[in-house]
Protein backbone atom coordinates (compact mmCIF):
# COMPACT_ATOMS: atom_id res chain seq x y z
CA UNK A 1 0.00 0.00 0.00
CA UNK A 2 1.34 3.43 -0.97
CA UNK A 3 2.42 5.58 1.95
CA UNK A 4 1.52 9.26 2.12
CA UNK A 5 4.13 12.00 2.04
CA UNK A 6 3.69 12.60 5.78
CA UNK A 7 4.13 8.90 6.52
CA UNK A 8 7.29 8.83 4.45
CA UNK A 9 8.68 11.70 6.51
CA UNK A 10 8.40 9.50 9.59
CA UNK A 11 10.36 6.58 8.12
CA UNK A 12 13.49 5.72 10.11
CA UNK A 13 16.48 6.16 7.81
CA UNK A 14 19.07 3.39 7.75
CA UNK A 15 22.04 3.80 10.11
CA UNK A 16 24.38 3.98 7.11
CA UNK A 17 22.55 6.93 5.57
CA UNK A 18 21.85 8.62 8.87
CA UNK A 19 25.53 8.75 9.84
CA UNK A 20 26.15 11.62 7.44
CA UNK A 21 22.95 13.36 8.53
CA UNK A 22 23.96 13.24 12.20
CA UNK A 23 27.32 14.85 11.41
CA UNK A 24 25.54 17.56 9.43
CA UNK A 25 22.18 18.42 11.02
CA UNK A 26 21.32 20.64 8.05
CA UNK A 27 18.02 19.71 6.45
CA UNK A 28 18.59 18.84 2.79
CA UNK A 29 17.21 21.09 0.08
CA UNK A 30 16.86 20.53 -3.65
CA UNK A 31 16.46 23.28 -6.23
CA UNK A 32 15.05 21.86 -9.47
CA UNK A 33 14.60 23.99 -12.56
CA UNK A 34 13.65 22.81 -16.05
CA UNK A 35 17.27 22.28 -16.99
CA UNK A 36 19.50 22.12 -13.91
CA UNK A 37 19.45 21.09 -10.27
CA UNK A 38 21.23 21.77 -6.98
CA UNK A 39 21.32 19.77 -3.74
CA UNK A 40 22.57 21.27 -0.47
CA UNK A 41 22.54 19.22 2.71
CA UNK A 42 24.24 16.32 4.46
CA UNK A 43 26.67 14.36 2.31
CA UNK A 44 25.34 10.98 3.49
CA UNK A 45 26.88 7.58 2.85
CA UNK A 46 25.51 6.83 -0.60
CA UNK A 47 25.68 3.52 -2.40
CA UNK A 48 27.61 3.35 -5.71
CA UNK A 49 25.62 4.98 -8.52
CA UNK A 50 25.74 6.60 -11.97
CA UNK A 51 24.45 10.15 -12.43
CA UNK A 52 22.97 10.92 -15.83
CA UNK A 53 24.17 14.52 -15.48
CA UNK A 54 27.76 15.57 -14.99
CA UNK A 55 27.99 16.52 -11.32
CA UNK A 56 30.16 18.89 -9.29
CA UNK A 57 30.48 17.55 -5.73
CA UNK A 58 31.45 20.27 -3.24
CA UNK A 59 32.39 19.94 0.42
CA UNK A 60 31.09 22.94 2.36
CA UNK A 61 33.14 21.97 5.40
CA UNK A 62 35.29 18.83 5.70
CA UNK A 63 36.60 16.67 2.80
CA UNK A 64 34.62 13.75 1.40
CA UNK A 65 35.86 10.36 0.21
CA UNK A 66 35.44 9.35 -3.45
CA UNK A 67 36.31 6.42 -5.66
CA UNK A 68 35.36 5.67 -9.27
CA UNK A 69 34.98 2.55 -11.39
CA UNK A 70 36.64 2.09 -14.76
CA UNK A 71 37.14 -0.75 -17.25
CA UNK A 72 39.63 -2.26 -17.07
CA UNK A 73 40.92 -1.85 -13.54
CA UNK A 74 37.77 -1.76 -11.43
CA UNK A 75 37.53 0.56 -8.44
CA UNK A 76 40.14 3.27 -7.96
CA UNK A 77 41.62 3.78 -4.49
CA UNK A 78 39.62 5.99 -2.15
CA UNK A 79 40.78 9.61 -2.31
CA UNK A 80 39.99 12.60 -0.14
CA UNK A 81 38.52 15.60 -1.99
CA UNK A 82 37.04 19.00 -1.24
CA UNK A 83 35.63 19.39 -4.77
CA UNK A 84 35.39 17.04 -7.73
CA UNK A 85 33.75 16.87 -11.16
CA UNK A 86 32.09 13.49 -11.72
CA UNK A 87 31.47 12.95 -15.45
CA UNK A 88 28.11 11.76 -16.70
CA UNK A 89 27.62 7.98 -16.66
CA UNK A 90 30.58 7.41 -14.30
CA UNK A 91 30.00 4.75 -11.65
CA UNK A 92 31.23 6.24 -8.40
CA UNK A 93 31.02 5.80 -4.64
CA UNK A 94 31.01 8.89 -2.43
CA UNK A 95 31.03 9.15 1.36
CA UNK A 96 30.50 12.59 2.78
CA UNK A 97 30.32 13.80 6.36
CA UNK A 98 29.12 17.30 6.97
CA UNK A 99 27.28 19.64 4.61
CA UNK A 100 27.81 19.28 0.87
CA UNK A 101 26.51 20.71 -2.38
CA UNK A 102 25.91 18.78 -5.59
CA UNK A 103 25.45 20.74 -8.82
CA UNK A 104 23.83 18.67 -11.57
CA UNK A 105 24.95 20.03 -14.92
CA UNK A 106 22.23 19.48 -17.47
CA UNK A 107 23.82 19.67 -20.94
CA UNK A 108 21.36 22.41 -21.93
CA UNK A 109 22.52 24.86 -19.29
CA UNK A 110 26.23 24.42 -18.92
CA UNK A 111 29.35 24.85 -20.99
CA UNK A 112 30.83 21.57 -22.11
CA UNK A 113 34.54 22.34 -22.00
CA UNK A 114 36.12 21.06 -18.78
CA UNK A 115 36.38 23.33 -15.78
CA UNK A 116 39.99 23.93 -14.79
CA UNK A 117 41.23 23.27 -11.27
CA UNK A 118 41.44 27.04 -10.80
CA UNK A 119 37.77 27.38 -11.89
CA UNK A 120 36.78 24.72 -9.37
CA UNK A 121 38.70 26.25 -6.48
CA UNK A 122 37.28 29.72 -7.19
CA UNK A 123 33.79 28.23 -7.25
CA UNK A 124 34.46 26.35 -4.02
CA UNK A 125 35.54 29.54 -2.27
CA UNK A 126 32.42 31.39 -3.46
CA UNK A 127 30.10 28.60 -2.33
CA UNK A 128 31.72 28.40 1.09
CA UNK A 129 31.47 32.17 1.51
CA UNK A 130 27.78 32.06 0.59
CA UNK A 131 27.16 29.25 3.07
CA UNK A 132 24.22 26.89 3.32
CA UNK A 133 21.67 29.42 2.08
CA UNK A 134 23.12 29.60 -1.42
CA UNK A 135 20.54 29.29 -4.18
CA UNK A 136 20.43 27.77 -7.64
CA UNK A 137 21.51 30.79 -9.69
CA UNK A 138 24.27 31.81 -7.27
CA UNK A 139 25.71 28.29 -7.12
CA UNK A 140 25.95 27.92 -10.90
CA UNK A 141 27.28 31.46 -11.34
CA UNK A 142 30.07 30.65 -8.88
CA UNK A 143 31.54 28.34 -11.53
CA UNK A 144 30.83 30.63 -14.48
CA UNK A 145 28.27 28.23 -15.92
CA UNK A 146 26.13 29.71 -18.69
CA UNK A 147 23.11 28.54 -20.68
CA UNK A 148 23.68 26.34 -23.70
CA UNK A 149 20.80 25.65 -26.07
CA UNK A 150 20.55 23.36 -29.10
CA UNK A 151 21.09 25.42 -32.24
CA UNK A 152 19.07 22.98 -34.30
CA UNK A 153 15.42 24.03 -33.98
CA UNK A 154 14.27 20.45 -34.54
CA UNK A 155 16.18 19.22 -31.50
CA UNK A 156 15.06 22.22 -29.43
CA UNK A 157 11.45 21.32 -30.32
CA UNK A 158 11.92 17.81 -28.93
CA UNK A 159 13.61 19.15 -25.79
CA UNK A 160 10.64 21.43 -25.11
CA UNK A 161 8.17 18.59 -25.62
CA UNK A 162 10.11 16.28 -23.29
CA UNK A 163 9.85 19.02 -20.65
CA UNK A 164 6.12 19.42 -21.19
CA UNK A 165 5.37 15.69 -21.46
CA UNK A 166 8.02 13.69 -19.58
CA UNK A 167 5.86 10.57 -19.72
CA UNK A 168 5.80 10.65 -23.54
CA UNK A 169 8.35 9.48 -26.12
CA UNK A 170 8.74 5.95 -24.80
CA UNK A 171 9.91 5.10 -28.30
CA UNK A 172 12.78 6.98 -29.90
CA UNK A 173 10.87 6.81 -33.21
CA UNK A 174 8.20 9.14 -31.78
CA UNK A 175 10.77 11.80 -30.91
CA UNK A 176 12.42 11.38 -34.31
CA UNK A 177 9.05 11.91 -36.02
CA UNK A 178 8.52 15.16 -34.11
CA UNK A 179 11.94 16.33 -35.32
CA UNK A 180 11.12 15.20 -38.90
CA UNK A 181 14.22 13.00 -38.94
CA UNK A 182 14.84 9.31 -39.37
CA UNK A 183 15.56 7.50 -36.06
CA UNK A 184 19.24 7.03 -36.91
CA UNK A 185 19.66 10.65 -37.99
CA UNK A 186 17.78 11.92 -34.93
CA UNK A 187 19.91 9.81 -32.59
CA UNK A 188 23.10 11.30 -34.04
CA UNK A 189 21.79 14.88 -34.13
CA UNK A 190 20.44 14.79 -30.57
CA UNK A 191 23.68 13.41 -29.19
CA UNK A 192 25.69 16.05 -31.05
CA UNK A 193 23.45 18.95 -29.97
CA UNK A 194 22.73 17.95 -26.37
CA UNK A 195 25.80 15.88 -25.52
CA UNK A 196 23.77 12.97 -24.14
CA UNK A 197 21.83 10.12 -25.79
CA UNK A 198 18.12 10.85 -26.07
CA UNK A 199 16.95 8.05 -23.77
CA UNK A 200 19.35 9.12 -21.02
CA UNK A 201 18.36 12.77 -21.36
CA UNK A 202 14.68 11.83 -21.20
CA UNK A 203 15.35 9.82 -18.02
CA UNK A 204 17.03 12.86 -16.44
CA UNK A 205 14.03 15.06 -17.23
CA UNK A 206 11.62 12.41 -15.92
CA UNK A 207 13.39 12.64 -12.57
CA UNK A 208 12.75 16.39 -12.60
CA UNK A 209 9.06 15.62 -13.15
CA UNK A 210 9.17 13.33 -10.10
CA UNK A 211 10.51 16.21 -8.00
CA UNK A 212 7.75 18.53 -9.25
CA UNK A 213 5.00 16.07 -8.33
CA UNK A 214 6.43 15.42 -4.86
CA UNK A 215 6.87 19.16 -4.25
CA UNK A 216 3.19 19.61 -5.07
CA UNK A 217 2.29 17.08 -2.37
CA UNK A 218 1.89 14.02 -4.57
CA UNK A 219 2.73 10.49 -3.46
CA UNK A 220 5.55 8.43 -4.92
CA UNK A 221 3.02 6.44 -6.95
CA UNK A 222 1.59 9.66 -8.40
CA UNK A 223 5.10 10.93 -9.10
CA UNK A 224 6.03 7.66 -10.81
CA UNK A 225 2.99 7.70 -13.09
CA UNK A 226 3.39 11.40 -13.93
CA UNK A 227 6.94 10.72 -15.10
CA UNK A 228 6.11 7.59 -17.07
CA UNK A 229 7.33 4.91 -14.64
CA UNK A 230 5.26 1.74 -14.37
CA UNK A 231 5.16 1.81 -10.55
CA UNK A 232 6.70 3.41 -7.46
CA UNK A 233 8.98 0.35 -7.18
CA UNK A 234 10.26 0.99 -10.73
CA UNK A 235 10.88 4.62 -9.81
CA UNK A 236 12.61 3.65 -6.56
CA UNK A 237 15.10 1.29 -8.21
CA UNK A 238 15.88 3.78 -10.99
CA UNK A 239 16.28 6.63 -8.49
CA UNK A 240 18.74 4.61 -6.41
CA UNK A 241 20.84 3.70 -9.47
CA UNK A 242 21.07 7.40 -10.32
CA UNK A 243 21.52 8.99 -6.88
CA UNK A 244 22.69 6.30 -4.47
CA UNK A 245 19.58 6.27 -2.27
CA UNK A 246 15.87 5.68 -2.78
CA UNK A 247 13.38 8.51 -3.15
CA UNK A 248 11.68 7.42 0.09
CA UNK A 249 15.02 7.62 1.96
CA UNK A 250 15.52 11.15 0.64
CA UNK A 251 12.02 12.20 1.68
CA UNK A 252 12.54 10.67 5.12
CA UNK A 253 15.36 13.15 5.73
CA UNK A 254 12.84 15.97 5.48
CA UNK A 255 14.09 17.34 2.15
CA UNK A 256 12.63 20.61 0.92
CA UNK A 257 12.14 20.99 -2.84
CA UNK A 258 12.35 24.42 -4.45
CA UNK A 259 11.02 24.56 -8.01
CA UNK A 260 13.06 27.59 -9.03
CA UNK A 261 12.12 29.23 -12.29
CA UNK A 262 14.57 28.70 -15.12
CA UNK A 263 14.06 30.37 -18.50
CA UNK A 264 16.38 28.14 -20.50
CA UNK A 265 13.51 26.68 -22.53
CA UNK A 266 12.26 30.09 -23.65
CA UNK A 267 15.84 31.03 -24.48
CA UNK A 268 16.11 27.91 -26.59
CA UNK A 269 13.00 29.02 -28.47
CA UNK A 270 14.74 32.22 -29.54
CA UNK A 271 18.28 30.96 -29.99
CA UNK A 272 17.63 27.83 -32.04
CA UNK A 273 18.14 28.06 -35.77
CA UNK A 274 16.10 26.21 -38.41
CA UNK A 275 18.10 23.51 -40.16
CA UNK A 276 17.69 22.07 -43.62
CA UNK A 277 18.37 18.34 -43.65
CA UNK A 278 18.13 16.56 -46.96
CA UNK A 279 19.05 13.22 -45.42
CA UNK A 280 15.86 12.41 -43.51
CA UNK A 281 15.87 8.89 -44.79
CA UNK A 282 19.49 8.32 -43.78
Where are these regions (language model features)?
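Compact structured core domains
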Residues: 79-171, 180
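N-terminal regulatory/effector-sensing and dimerization cores
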Residues: 12-116
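Basic/polar phosphate-binding segments, predominantly the helix-turn-helix DNA-binding elements
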Residues: 173-202, 224-249
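Short, Lys/Arg-enriched N-terminal segment that forms or immediately precedes the first helix
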Residues: 39-41, 139-147, 187-195
Amino acid sequence: MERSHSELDAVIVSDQLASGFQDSPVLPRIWAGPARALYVGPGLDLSPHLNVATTIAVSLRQPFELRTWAKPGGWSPWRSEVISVIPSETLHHLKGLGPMAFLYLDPLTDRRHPLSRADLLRGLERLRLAGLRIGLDEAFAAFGLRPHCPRDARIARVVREVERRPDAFGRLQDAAALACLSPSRFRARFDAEVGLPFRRYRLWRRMAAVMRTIAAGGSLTEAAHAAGFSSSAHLSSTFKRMFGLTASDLLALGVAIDLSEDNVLSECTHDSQPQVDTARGA
